[in-house]
């Protein structure tokens, strides 16, 4: 088979492209179509492991889940993982090919288009419909040369485009009409419809606005999509999701402090905890202190462990964490957070930056050496308390000193992670720990709460079903299928 194609681009970042594709993937799948998601280029430190040992953006993993299809590196052939303000690791078809500064990457892009189109053609043979997500803003004409993410891809793949604007942030008419004005005619001709997303209030009050947009752009209106409140219950890919206020839960019995460091990665590890009614996550930014009543300090993964460790120390959070342990609190480090808890972190080959060896927090008797080889694998095993676990590993670096120590878990016969002698500090390389209902329940009990009866996977699927129904009600899905080609 050769699939029909439909691409969704946005007037800016975080206008709802990822969830639009996820919801439509579930909606069209429920109509009996086979659907696969595709994003030519993604920038995110939240990644998922594919069955063939590669990695793709977490948004594409959620979209694949919505469509009921296994993950493939071809769903996100170019993944950029920021390592600094100006540079990123470049992952092509699931494998690291190097790192590049922003200016250098602009020259790399022309050579990446053949790989992008190769992945796209591969997916077209597997489904009835390919739903493509653009990146950032369609109107970034300064980046149009060698573009592989938006109009450059749409033109190369002959993919009709639906443009999404976010009315919740204001100025949606200007952003949609303005996009039409700055695009050249050939690019603008690829856009065949528009969606106004995240509307609040009486839709009748914006009927004139929808008409004006259509008149000024000559695009079809696909619909005015009301705000979907349950969107917060789905995994967020971008760190933008961490920049807003946290969900307050005054009656929560368990408070967990999460340092928000500049290169935090795989922070979707927090989502299952956030869904628990008895858990309140406290985001602690540099310059803030860890509340004394928190039961657990959770150090998430990091794309730049040494740099984030320096920020943590400069902010005095290392002192806070050690005081938390002295008060009898728990600390759990995941992946990069685990590395920070050890005695030293060494980067002799300059994997993350200039070669260096730095002192860790010294709360675990381990040392880490960062290496060029990356471990990407889904895992199953048993944790130290005999509870089963499933998750995935995604890291560079080898951590030694585990022999003779209490190990966190046993994975396929080998030891993972370690525990301090007093049983208060834990470190593991396993991501997805709290998405495992067994592990999450055990940790809630350890922290003084009750085990959970919440089925996280079922909750996510239920939200995807509601999102699909929301789109069926408010968008013209038949028109979308007619536009797809």
UniProtKB/Swiss-Prot annotation:
Pathway: Cofactor biosynthesis; adenosylcobalamin biosynthesis. One of its GO terms (molecular function) is ABC-type vitamin B12 transporter activity. The active site is at residues 335, 431. Residues 253-439 form the GATase cobBQ-type domain. SUPFAM superfamilies: Class I glutamine amidotransferase-like, P-loop containing nucleoside triphosphate hydrolases. Disulfide bonds: none annotated. GO terms for biological process: cobalamin biosynthetic process. Pfam families: CbiA, GATase_3. It comes from the Bacteria. InterPro entries: Class_I_gatase-like, CobQ/CobB/MinD/ParA_Nub-bd_dom, CobQ_GATase1, CobQ_synth, GATase_3, P-loop_NTPase. Signal peptide: none annotated. Keywords: Cobalamin biosynthesis, Glutamine amidotransferase. Belongs to the CobB/CobQ family. CobQ subfamily. Catalyzes amidations at positions B, D, E, and G on adenosylcobyrinic A,C-diamide. NH(2) groups are provided by glutamine, and one molecule of ATP is hydrogenolyzed for each amidation. This is Cobyric acid synthase. The gene is cobQ.
